[in-house]
Amino acid sequence: CEIGRSAVKGRAVLYPQPFGKVTAGADKDYPVDFSHFNIQGTCVGAVGVEADSDKAIFPAVDIATEVGAKDKIKMRVPFFTGALGSTEIARLHWEGIAVGAGISGTLVVVGENVCGMDPQAEFKNGRVVNSPELKRRVEIFKQWQEDAGEIVVQYNVEDGRLGVPQYAVEKLGVKMIEAKWGQGAKDIGGEVKLPSLERAKQLKERGYIVLPDPDSPVNQDAFRAGAFTEFERHSRLGMVDEEKFVQQFVREVAGLRSLGAKHISLKTGAYRPADLARAVRCASEARIDLLTVDGAGGGTGMSPWRMMNEWGIPTVYLECLLHNYLSRLAKKGAFI
């Protein structure tokens, strides 16, 4: 059916449908994935609770943890949310996820392009000075945050150019900033579909790559005539210099700290093994607080089907590589 529809509809079936209303991930089977792992318990002793038959019930177990290099962030649960960026489905469901993270005492991550995609955002000299959408997201979490957890604001190439980290730290009081290499689980696929010419032109003015070019009279006429019905906004891929990647990242982290960011995170996608090694080394030498390694299979779940299915290293295999790299660094006495 998918092949048949593609033959008839072409680009219309590149993405999971209906676009913006559903999330989807890769449906490709691998020899090993997380569904093959089961939790192994024991009747001898206990971890996280006293080994007492009258006390060892699962609601009583302490599963709290912490993240951070120097100043630790307390977390009442050992997991946190994925990054929820500028997609419509992320915007619609932000409140429930942010409230849940605040109550649970964990991290919630604002993904890329939120300010750039905010229709009501205000810019001065190419820098964001007001973003009601980012402000809304931060305030919702802070209303429900107690003594644990934190809100993280992620930035990519466009966000950096628009001054999103500065705005988040200085104007909204955000304490944790996440640098992003590429497009997370999709590596290079940072697309959003745009249904109107006005929206396409607005985002091009804000510095995004928009295809087809909405300023071209030929494309404008073709769009109005119905030759195509949507534009695509693309995010740029963050390029890392092969020889100077560590120095580049250390400088970037120092710049974020000088802004007042208390905690720094790096998010890298499911690139080839050498790139994961670069990310691990950068994280170690810059002594950041958190490294997020995003496996293949889909991010928010609105990427092209082929990107989610055919690109990157599956998560289990990627985590095995990560464990290997960290173990090797630990043996050398490096910062982990």
Question: Where are each of the predicted segments found?
Answer:
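Hydrophobic faces of well-ordered beta-strands that scaffold small-molecule active sites
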Residues: 77-82, 106-112, 149-155, 175-181, ...
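Glycine-rich phosphate/ribose-binding loops and adjacent secondary-structure elements
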Residues: 228-336
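Conserved, well-structured core domains of diverse proteins
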Residues: 1-76, 89-95, 99-102, 107, ...
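Active-site mouth loops of central-metabolism enzymes
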Residues: 79-92, 154-160, 183, 236-245, ...
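Active-site-adjacent beta->alpha loops and helix N-cap segments on the catalytic face
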Residues: 90-91, 118-138, 159-166, 187-195, ...
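Flavin-dependent oxidoreductase catalytic cores
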Residues: 75-78, 92, 97, 106-107, ...
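Phosphate/diphosphate-binding loops
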Residues: 142-170, 317, 324, 333-334
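Metal-dependent enolase-superfamily TIM-barrel catalytic cores that perform enediolate-based chemistry
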Residues: 174-182, 186-188, 192-271
